[in-house]
Amino acid sequence: MTSASITNTGNETMNLPQMRSIWLDEDEEAEKLYGLQAQQFMGSDDEENLGITFINSDKPVLSNKKNIELPPLSPNSHPSCHHRRSNSNSAKSKESSSSSSSANKTNHKKVFLKLNLLKKKLLGAQPDIRGKGISTPFDFQHISHADTRNGFQDEQLQEPSSLSTEIKDDYTSSSSKRDSKSLNKAFVTERIPANRESKLISRSHENKTSRLSVARSISVTSSNYSKNTQGNNHSINGRVVSTSTMATSIFEYSPNASPKQFKNKSHALGHRYTNSTDSSESSLDFLKNYNFPTLLEDKPILDFLPRSQRSSAYRSLLETPNSNKDSAKAFFPSRQSPLPKRRNSIATPSPQSKFSYSDSPVNHRKSFDDVLYSFNQLEPLQT
């Protein structure tokens, strides 16, 4: 924003100071300016009235449009006026001193020259204040943004050089000492030194745990590194070795290994239940010895017996109950609750089934409680 005005005060013309720029630092001030533009284009609302009067050259607001009287400016507000007044005063003094003798003139000139030389030596060359100074009309306070470029430019210039040196040091040097600048970033962890890593590799070869590739699992390396640091430094603040990190090791992959080698390793481990290496035989033996969880359907239990034993079982069931007590006990023992009775078990009722499988017809649908009760009855026969 630039503005200039000239006023006639008597016979002399005085240039008012110019307001060259306004920097808004606060967001609220910027919102006021945007809201002021919205009021001009859309109309003002009583609720959101900002209370700002905008003075425009097209629509003057002041009543007195000509010969505006202004208070006299202080000499500090505008250095150019003070400079002109001092020049005029010096000119008047020169005119008055012309009547004096020539010896006094030469003496005064010599004194002024000596004073100027001393000022230049002590203060140096003074820059032009008019070009760089900010005008302050009517005690206006200049608002400017905080200059953050000076603080961040040095860091931006130093970052690429420091990064390049750090990368070279990681691959060339084996020392663990680093500059403090490299650790001024978030999520930075120190790399395992090369000499300690070589010791870990030699120890792993001695314990017959050779690695297949350089890319080891993170859990094993972290646990081994913590062991090494605790053993060498004996520090209280050392890392605590946890069993969870040591137990998460997996098969390591190497680019030179073929898929046949992995198959041979899996076959050499053997089956989980049998020690045989043949996968087909182990699966058959596992299926033969495995007890599948069965759920009884509408068919009676005797249908699960072999065909040669079904006829004898049916005949024994069709006989009279008095003559077939022993056979009935063999297949269906006495109805008792599977839960053991206690002395103080009056308040806990025991589950009782209404009928057994021998009394029920063939096509009768059983409930789940009856199926559980039948399994509890047949448990002694299986053992």
From Swiss-Prot:
Cell inner membrane in keyword set: no
GO terms (BP aspect): Cdc42 protein signal transduction; establishment of cell polarity; positive regulation of formin-nucleated actin cable assembly; regulation of cell shape; regulation of exit from mitosis; septin ring organization
Subunit structure: Interacts with GTP-bound CDC42.
Region (Disordered): 63-106, 155-189, 319-361
Modified residues (Phosphoserine): 254, 258, 337, 345, 367
Keywords: Cell shape, Cytoplasm, Cytoskeleton, Phosphoprotein
Xref: CDD domains: CRIB
Family of this protein: Belongs to the BORG/CEP family.
Chief site of localization: other
Protein name listed in UniProt: GTPase-interacting component 2
Any one GO cellular component localisation term in the record: plasma membrane
Source domain of life: Eukaryota
GO MF: phosphatidylinositol-4,5-bisphosphate binding; small GTPase binding
Subcellular location: Bud neck; Bud tip; Cytoplasm, Cell cortex; Cytoplasm, Cytoskeleton
Domain CRIB span(s) in chain numbering: 134-147
Basic and acidic residues composition bias: residue spans: 166-182
Family matches, as InterPro entries: CRIB_dom (IPR000095)
Note: Present with 1130 molecules/cell in log phase SD medium.
Known role: Required for cell size and shape control, bud site selection, bud emergence, actin cytoskeletal organization, mitotic spindle orientation/positioning, and mating projection formation in response to mating pheromone.
Bias (Polar residues) ranges: 155-165, 345-361
Biased composition (Low complexity): 87-105
